[in-house]
Amino acid sequence: VTEKSTEVLGRDLGLGLGLRNVHFEHILEHWPAVDWFEAISENFMDSGGRPRDVIRRVAERYPVVLHGVSLSVGSTDPLNLDYLARLKALAAEIQPAWVSDHLCWTGILGQNSHDLLPLPLTEEALDHVAARVDRVQDFLGRRLILENPSSYLTFSHSTVEEPAFLRALAERTGCGLLLDVNNVFVSAFNAGTDPQAYLDDFPFERVVQLHLAGHSHRGTHIIDTHDCPVRAEVWELFARAWEATDGAATLLEWDGDIPNFETCHAELLKARDFMDGPTHAAAPAPLAADGRDAVSTPVDFMIPNAMAAVRGDQT
């Protein structure tokens, strides 16, 4: 297969935050000194009214990136063309710097798990995902950016390491990559592997964006919860990734137990302390298990409310 464009976007976008509804009022009142915002696609593509008005107004003043959680590019179900049409319409209106999602599947037989599930990494899976990425990019009329997921299991029949899989996928399709360094740490801990070895083989030249987030340590495993500050071990990985990507756009995710905007912004700005390379990173603190309830990759906005309504939960 002929290798497609290696053009890399996002090198100079700077430091960004997730656009979360609990911060709408603060953002619209203060227009804070943030370089850019990332919006969860599903939280805005199906909503009119205030959320759509807010993202329009934010997009007039800041670069915005759309980040999806329901493309399910790894599923064996047919691609959801209705979903893609709604995503395309939102992108046409907002004009994001790029559109991203995850190397994962979220459901099968029309049922959505509302989680980002890992794939068996095989040549067959690579062929399958590459064909679907090509279709998505053709449909959207724009390049897709794909993120490495957090994983809580590995497949015994996987034959390709994830960095090599992502490299081959990017070469075949021309898609960009979103390197989530928290996911690297979470997946490596859960699999008993070395996160630095993962980065040794990662195709940094394909990276458009970096993700930072906090996680919940449960003793025997780690859950990607996005509900606390970034751990020292993840900052160490970020320092290396920042240097290796020559300063790719960096985004802090905080989706559960979201503090005020100033706290999130202050956590994001810690990235500046690590931009001179790994030797400047703080020494990692020993991992200690915590007792918090943990939900993997929460989207703390409309999706949980919608699921509660489906279940008939009372508020």
Regions found by a protein language model. Give the residues of each.
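N-terminal pre-domain/capping segments
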Residues: 1-89
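Acidic-and-aromatic substrate-binding clefts and catalytic sites of carbohydrate-active enzymes
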Residues: 24, 41-53, 72-82, 152-159, ...
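Acidic (Asp/Glu)-rich catalytic clusters
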Residues: 27-32, 49-66, 82-97, 136-139, ...
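Conserved, mostly hydrophobic/aromatic
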Residues: 37, 99, 144, 180, ...
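Gly/Pro-rich active-site loop or hairpin
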Residues: 46-48, 78, 116-122, 126, ...
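Active-site acidic/histidine proton-transfer and metal-coordination neighborhood
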Residues: 80-177
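Non-cysteine beta-strand/loop elements that form the S-adenosyl-L-methionine
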Residues: 98-105, 177-179, 205-216
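Long, low-complexity, charge-dense
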Residues: 265-315
